[in-house]
């Protein structure tokens, strides 16, 4: 699949917490850094997300939130 987003980070799923509707996915990227995303449980199932899976996070610059 071809996408236009330039902010793509490859990594490994090191955490997965499933809720009733959504899931929290933790991806370890280069340098041991981690990013966390909340996605729908349907997406987790459709994409086959599981701990240890190699995935690519696609990040739109307009959808980034910074927490302190």
UniProtKB/Swiss-Prot annotation:
Gene behind this protein: mopI
Species: Clostridium pasteurianum
Biological processes annotated in GO: molybdate ion transport
Keywords, comma-separated and alphabetical: Molybdenum
Chain ranges of the Mop domain: 2-68
Source species taxonomy: Bacteria, Bacillati, Bacillota, Clostridia, Eubacteriales
Pfam families reported for this sequence: TOBE (PF03459)
Its job: Binds one mole of molybdenum per mole of protein and contains a pterin.
Protein name as it appears in the record: Molybdenum-pterin-binding protein 1
Statement: the UniProt record of this protein carries the keyword Glycoprotein: no
This protein's record includes keyword DNA damage: no
């Amino acid at each position: 699949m071809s996408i236009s987003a330039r902010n793509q980070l490859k990594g490994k799923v090191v955490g997965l917490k499933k809720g009733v509707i959504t899931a929290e996915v933790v991806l370890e990227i280069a340098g041991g850094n981690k990013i966390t995303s909340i996605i729908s449980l349907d997406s987790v199932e459709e994409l086959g997300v599981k701990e240890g899976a190699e995935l690519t996070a696609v990040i739109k610059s307009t959808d980034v939130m910074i927490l302190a």
